[in-house]
Amino acid sequence: MASWDIFCSVVDNYGDIGVTWRLARQLAAEHGQAVRLWVDEPQAFARICPRADPVAHVQCLDGVEVRAWGRPWAPVAAADVVIEAFACELPEAHRQAMRERKRPSLWLNLEYLSAEEWIGSCHALPSLQACGLSKYFFFPGFREPSGGLLREAGLLERRRRFQASVSAQDEFLASLGVRRKVGERLISLFAYENPALPGWLEQLRDARQPSLLLVPEGRVLADVADWLRVATLAVGDVHVRDALRVQVLPFMAQDDYDRLLWCCDLNAVRGEDSFVRAQWAGRPLLWHIYRQEEETHLAKLEAFLELYCAGLPADLAENLRTFWLAWNAGGGLAGAWEGLERQLPEWRREAQRWADEQGMRPDLAARLVQFYADWL
């Protein structure tokens, strides 16, 4: 059994801590590793893990030792493997502790997920640092070579069983205060602020098929309130506009959010963690990518669309691509959604195929464990 330090700096939203918490749990549960997760904002961690104590300096959850990443840093012995998630800067004293071990620590920089081809030439390459240690860059991805995707053992089978049971879905939705009506399409919305949202909500309002839009607490809630012309929205609120019913859900733990995705006919997601989980749901998805300076995020979006659409029928691929690009550009959804809405059943089959294909590849945690074994 190896020891692991995973450092997470919560820069924005919950994607960084979401990814690192899933990874830490999987390393401990499935690979028997001793994991310490260092978090600089324990309050953010407590949002995705309600069992967590937001003021505790040290706590053990799901076999993971979760520690507050305090400043100034209180030196501790370094682990066999040290992961800096998403280029967060390790404490200088910890880098020194890594170097002074009898066998220096394996230093990994866990990069952001990307479908871009260039990551294949950079994945797992070392970079000699000023302190004398080599840092290896580990890129999660959808093609080889890459670090793969986070996926717990048995995840897809659990999802299939859940989606095959209407009673299991209804019971879960009822625990959130949701009652699905016959013939109602379920859509989840977890996004950044988006000027394209009102146009889409208008189309859902005017559609022939009724929709229930489930909106967990988050940044997009203010945009939804503006469209509804209400001052505020709170958990449990329900508003009806013609064919569209909108219900506000609480911010939920990761496993519950997975089940919400499994219940829905379409999932609008954001960032990285929910993006990957929506793919494992095997359902149509709409990705709101995190905006970066100089529009560099658009290259990542295009790269994923190229890969995701490669096996789709031409008309579905065209409508999907147009809709995604408009959603991320902030408007112009009308024509794309009209075509895409008719293709949702076909898109669902393709989404299941995509999840199955990606599910055949080794997962991120397994690849990290193997990389360490090969490095020794």
From Swiss-Prot:
UniProt-recorded Gene Ontology molecular function terms: protein-arginine rhamnosyltransferase activity
Broad EC category: transferase
Residue numbers binding dTDP: 14-15, 192, 252-254, 270-274
Disruption outcome: Reduced bacterial fitness and reduced pathogenicity.
Pfam families linked: EarP
Keyword Glycosyltransferase: yes
Effect of residue 12 to N: Decreased but not abolished protein-arginine rhamnosyltransferase activity
InterPro entries per record: EarP
Enzyme nomenclature, EC number: 2.4.1.-
Positions contributing to dTDP-beta-L-rhamnose binding: 13-16, 192, 252-254, 270-274
List of catalytic residues: 16 (proton acceptor), 272
Catalysed transformations (reactions): dTDP-beta-L-rhamnose + L-arginyl-[protein] = N(omega)-(alpha-L-rhamnosyl)-L-arginyl-[protein] + dTDP + H(+)
Keyword annotations from UniProtKB, A to Z: Glycosyltransferase, Transferase
Entry comment, domain topic: Adopts a GT-B fold and acts as an inverting enzyme that converts the beta-configuration in the dTDP-beta-L-rhamnose donor to the alpha configuration in the N-linked (Rha) arginine product.
Function (record text): Protein-arginine rhamnosyltransferase that catalyzes the transfer of a single rhamnose to elongation factor P (EF-P) on 'Lys-32', a modification required for EF-P-dependent rescue of polyproline stalled ribosomes.
Family of the protein in this entry: Belongs to the glycosyltransferase 104 family.
Protein name, entry field: Protein-arginine rhamnosyltransferase
Organism, scientific name: Pseudomonas aeruginosa (strain ATCC 15692 / DSM 22644 / CIP 104116 / JCM 14847 / LMG 12228 / 1C / PRS 101 / PAO1)
Gene that encodes the chain: earP
